[in-house]
Amino acid sequence: AGQVLMTLGLKGQSGNGRDTFRKPSAVLVAPNGDIFVADGHDATGNNRIVKFAADGSYLTEWGGTGSANGQFRDPHALAMDSAGRLFVGDRANSRIQIFDQSGKHLATWTQFGRPSGLYIDRNDVLYATDSESNTGRNPGWRRGVYIGSAKTGWVSAFIPDPEPDQDNSGT
């Protein structure tokens, strides 16, 4: 059996404080050990990114509910590129927002669909999974995997979802 090394948040309590979350959906550990938490799985979540030091001590947070740069509606996925930029899959806003590690907004990309998952490989190839686009939720987009450059945002390939009923929403 494994051993719990660290716990963030308070067991059995939800909230929007430094030591509470409301529906966290993703965690990323940076190369230096800092920990980023995407807190806000749906409309009732906190819609924020919370940053902790490697020892679990609170450092900062940013976000809030909305569609302006730096705000979120369901921050659902996190990834980091070789330059240390933090990519946030802002799913309900159908975009990826990019930040420095202090929370400064650097860019917003809307060409990767409605991102549910993000992965950036060592060559800065970005893989963004869209499991929710369909006629009702995100017209004009298709569920699948968007593949592109984490440096430029250029989408170079798309792998469609093999499910034949594109109007049946995923998770």
What do the predicted segments below correspond to?
Residues 1-171:
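Eukaryotic scaffold repeat domains enriched in small/polar residues
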